[in-house]
């Protein structure tokens, strides 16, 4: 059975469906750019310019006199004044720190100086003048005086950095010292509080030994009799309280303090018969003289004083 040929409308719809599917696939892969355009990647071409490479090689191989080139190659140059190796010199041999301005500038200076010293004999052999004529007044980019100023400035900067580092270390040490001192003081306070609590317990009879004693001394143990006395004393007031009661009087509970007891009832040592029956040496009918003046006398004295 032969299939009927597709019409133009059917072919256009199939093309649209295919293009829509391609756009969806490109969008899912992230290849769509603004404007719904798909950027097609072009294949990279390997450039092999043989003639250009040969021309560069010919320029490298050009044999010129050294006077025309005046090139010299030197490695890292150590300081001349260094006789013994130091950790700083060993670090310089390993490599110059690009962040250190002083070290970097000094390496440039030493390398340039060594290159000049290596080239001068060869220039003298070739009879090339190396000194500036007297009528040549053009100065170089940086004179020796300017270089000396730069050197002094770099030295000052390095000294300031070292001073700042030392100050930081001192501050850190002081902070650590204060922290240690605070810990020591807190430890002493805790030990003192523990010792005072142990002494109070020992005095009140709650403990029979003192654990804070150190050294060769054995811990003091309370005997049975001492412990018994301590327990008995703990029931009543201590010596300080008894002394204050004796001096200022008992300031505690007053209710029932004047009640009679069996011991006070049987105690007749303070009984005086003459005083009880009024047979003392006092004269009857005479009372002690009243030293305070009367009301009228006080008013008269007050008016006279005005």
UniProtKB/Swiss-Prot annotation:
Primary place of residence? nucleus
Q: Which residues carry this modification: Phosphothreonine?
A: 3
Chain positions covered by the region annotation Disordered: 1-20, 75-103, 150-169, 213-306
Q: Which GO terms describe its cellular component?
A: chromosome; nucleolus
Annotated membrane-spanning segments are: none
Instruction: Note whether ATP-binding occurs among the keywords.
Output: no
Task: Name the coiled-coil region(s).
Answer: 135-171
| Positions carrying Phosphoserine | 7, 9, 11, 13, 264, 270
Q: Which cysteines are joined by disulfide bonds?
A: none
Return the Polar residues bias intervals.
81-90
Q: Which InterPro entries match?
A: Ebp2
GO BP annotations of the record are: ribosome biogenesis
Compositional bias ranges of the Basic and acidic residues kind: 91-103, 213-224
This protein's source sits in the domain of life called Eukaryota
- Could you list this entry's UniProt keywords, alphabetically sorted: Acetylation, Coiled coil, Isopeptide bond, Nucleus, Phosphoprotein, Ribosome biogenesis, Ubl conjugation
Comp. bias regions, Basic residues: 274-306
Write out the annotated subcellular location: Nucleus, Nucleolus
The cross-link Glycyl lysine isopeptide (Lys-Gly) (interchain with G-Cter in SUMO2): at which residues? 93, 179, 218
Residues bearing N-acetylmethionine are 1
Subunit structure and binding partners: Interacts with WDR46.
The family note in this entry says: Belongs to the EBP2 family.
What is the protein name for this chain? Probable rRNA-processing protein EBP2
